[in-house]
Amino acid sequence: MRTIINNQKKERDILLSRPYLTRHTQYDVDELTASKQIKLITGPRRTGKSTEALLMLKDRNFAYLNFDDGKLLSAWDDDLVWETLRAVYPDFEYLLLDEVQNLDGWDLWVSKLYRMGINMVITGSNAKLLSSEMATLLTGRYIQIEMLPFSLSEFFIWNHRNLSEVSEMKDSASDLSLIADYLHHGGYPETVAARSLTQNYLSTLFDSIIWKDIAKRHKVRNVEDLNNLAMYLVSNFCNPFSANELAEALGFSSVATTKKFMGYLREPYLLYYLPRYNNKLKVMKKAPQKVYVVDNGFVEAKAFSVSENLGRLLENQVFIELVRRGYHAETSLFYYRSRNDKETDFVTRQGAHVESLIQVCYDLSSERTLKREVDSIIECAGELKCSNLIIVTMNEERVIEKNGYKVKVLPIYKF
């Protein structure tokens, strides 16, 4: 055990020696580390959770365990691990547990350490496992921080540009090129510095998530059906669907299995499902949901269709940005369809109050397109009694006044 933990310490020190981009979170690092609550950093695989945890603790005395290490898991013994940690890291003040969900019974061990007064930072890639088990044993004892792929702003910083200082994109071909790059290839940290490797890297990562995070964990026997469903949903991102429609389209014999697989695909933060807004929960649950992908790069890497759909790529980007800002599907983020079947892409809600309606349209230069998008958002605004109306575009900015409403048209770089 001592050899395993010593080797992990060497890996930790190598990781700490590398340069990193400081990510944007809503928390102050000093306040976080001072808190005795468990710091839970969640999100998809390979989005920088471990890096964020290391940066949080880099100037502090901390011990480190990496649960992606099969040797550690196979040799696991609670008392032996604790004894060895104390020997390898004398007088450590913090404990970093990386990808802790890989340890069977991790929640009981973490709960024990918490009662001992250990100040912990935990990372994990499984939304359901972490949320359910943390909620069961550690309610009110942890702070959750969600790490997603780089935002557009972070992508600009990586490329030595500042998005907030760009005032007129129309005069900057290089800035527009960066946005187009991000729109197509996404923001996974490992890919932003090596775009030629993006498709291969994300294809491999996607397959790893299907096999390691889902099929192996849930003991899925028909992995081919699971993979086909994942590929179908990624190919049809931003579109509404129901489990019955998916089962029929893919030739699955069981709608129940389809629903179960859909849930599995959500757990590792691969896909998100957005419900249609309705004040009646039962009606909302029955309506088709729209599917979104955690990063646009997965679309290029795994989608069936080779045809380009800039509008859907932009819509997916806006959805992930809303999630990054703290909105959650089913509680504060929805789509909406009016009684006349006019649709608004996103409804944000604060408590019981509808906060804003957001429509996404890549290009409004066509009068027909402009009329369709503006009429849709205004009709939905009337039904939902909302006056904060936004249309996000690739590169247009203006204010449109119609029927007593003001619709703000914003380019994606100002959203």
Where are these regions (language model features)?
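Accessory nucleic acid-recognition modules appended to NTPase machines
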Residues: 196-354
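Interdomain motor-coupling "hinge/lid" segment immediately C-terminal to the ATP-binding subdomain
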Residues: 2-14, 133-240
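Domain-level recognition of nuclease-like catalytic cores that cleave nucleotide substrates
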Residues: 394-415
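Hydrophobic anchor at the beta1->P-loop junction of P-loop NTPases
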Residues: 41
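Conserved lysine of the Walker
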Residues: 49-50
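Short glycine-rich substrate-engagement loop in P-loop NTPases that contacts/grips substrate
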Residues: 63-93
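A short, basic N-terminal segment
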Residues: 1-32
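Structural recognition of the conserved hydrophobic beta-strand(s) that form the central parallel beta-sheet
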Residues: 119-125, 146
